[in-house]
């Protein structure tokens, strides 16, 4: 699934304008451009954004490929310790739902927590997705 680039936390106003100036308007396009170390280096040179920030945004976009995960849940997963789609594949639904509840209690990120069943569906969907981001 692809969403407007501004659906990623931290990409608004000026950041969105810079990304749009290099042809990145969607989460799908960001993921394509920032999926490799080389791609992130090139994008950093074009935009002036730090490579680590670009990787962070790419990981959010990657999590948003999973059916049912939009901005808020992608960020909540991060707060619960799930940085990547690959991380999500190996999680236990009950433990992750609990970790998400604890993270939400601390940070108040979403109004409605996903059920353990929904979290389990996310995990199953993550297992079916082809990995997009390389880290080496």
Tell what function each PLM region has:
Residues 1-136:
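C-terminal extensions
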